Amino acid sequence: MKILKDLIEKADDTLEEIEWYAEKAHHLRTEHKPLADCYIKIAEMHINIYNMLHEKMVMLIEEKKSKDVAVPHEMQVIWDYEHQKLIKEFAEAKYLIEEYKKMGY
């Protein structure tokens, strides 16, 4: 399903953006705190974008299942793998943001 593939790719891109901004915020925290704070806010905005994409990915799979349309085995295997990978990467990105906040954001 091309739509699901596109959503997975976009979610992955969004996670990379979250990590980039969060890592930059950590590096700039002492050197330029206002910019670091801005980067964390942008990372948090990307969290919202990621959550919307994730919601739609899950919705697509659930729609297929609810219509009694068998999700092709290959598609389910790919989805399961990609979904777990995205969840793990999301947790790592979220951790970077939370660590920054603990340091006094």
What residue spans do the PLM features occupy?
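Iron-associated oxidoreductase/ferritin-like identity signal
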Residues: M1-Y105
